[in-house]
A protein has these predicted regions:
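Outer-membrane beta-barrel domain signature
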Residues: 27, 54-60, 95-99, 142-146, ...
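Gram-negative (and chloroplast) outer-membrane scaffold detector with strong preference
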Residues: 70-141, 145-151, 161-167, 204-217
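Short glycine/proline- and aromatic-enriched beta-strand/turn motifs that initiate or cap beta-hairpins
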Residues: 24-76, 80-81, 208-217
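A structural signal for short, well-ordered beta-strand segments
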Residues: 40, 126-128, 173
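Outer-membrane beta-barrel porins/channels
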Residues: 154-156
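Predominantly the C-terminal beta-signal and adjacent terminal strand-loop region
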Residues: 158-217
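Cleavable N-terminal export/targeting peptides
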Residues: 1-31
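Outer-membrane beta-barrel proteins
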Residues: 45-51, 90-96, 133-139, 179-185, ...
Length: 217
């Protein structure tokens, strides 16, 4: 191979690199994002598995604390996918007993960054996942535990203000839809599987309002 051909190949490589380098340097977003939020959650229907069925008690237990942790990967400026954990907890008591309700959602998310500027980001994602319900309750001094697992769909919207390229503060709204098909109860030494008929008392649908931090890298 003569020197002229070698020089031509080297020039071609140099030209190719000079064309591609600006394209990569124009990426003005970080590919990875971790975010953590906490706030308020409310169920649209009466929570299932409670030890008291009065309307006021059911509405009290339908409201509680919510929190979530999210990871998102952005291969393109507006396209994003990742995973999410979302939790909910509420508790109450009455003369005959008490309830401590937990609802956990673990699933995948896919969506879009509808707005992405130097300081602002709006991200909307949705996806399916598993829903775990637990009620650590007590009736007449005896422990009663209820467990259930089902499938749900969670839609998540976040508005983030970026303090710097790596850190932001955000507001979030989450809507989770899910219904129970059956549950397992353990009370007074007996274990029972209860099949549910799909009325409002089996609906776990809720909305969360949260605030937190996002870290980009």
């Amino acid at each position: 191979m003569n020197q002229t051909l070698i020089k031509a190949i080297l020039l071609l490589i140099a030209f190719t690199l000079s064309c591609h380098t600006p394209l990569f340097s124009q990426r003005d977003f970080e590919r990875h994002e971790f975010s953590f939020h906490a706030g308020y959650g409310v169920m649209f229907h009466h929570p299932p598995t409670l030890t008291l069925s009065t309307h006021s008690y059911q509405r009290t237990l339908a409201q509680g604390e919510s929190w979530d942790g999210q990871y998102n990967f952005r291969p393109l400026k507006r396209f994003v996918f990742g995973g999410i954990y979302s939790g909910f907890s509420s508790k109450g008591s009455h003369p005959e007993g008490k309830d401590h309700l937990w609802v956990h959602f673990i699933g995948t998310q896919i969506g879009m960054c509808n707005v992405n500027t130097k300081h602002w980001q709006i991200r909307v994602t949705t996806g399916p996942g598993g829903v775990i319900l637990r009620n650590n309750s007590e009736v007449f001094g005896k422990t009663r535990k209820v467990k259930a697992f089902t499938i749900g769909l969670l839609t998540n919207a976040n508005l983030t203000y970026k303090l710097n390229p790596n850190l932001g503060v955000s507001l979030g709204v989450q809507y989770m839809y899910s219904e129970l098909l059956r549950m397992r109860t353990h009370y007074h030494g007996e274990r029972v599987i209860v099949k549910l008929d799909g009325n409002n008392d089996t609906n776990l649908t809720r909305i969360n309002f949260t605030t937190g931090l996002s870290y980009y890298f």
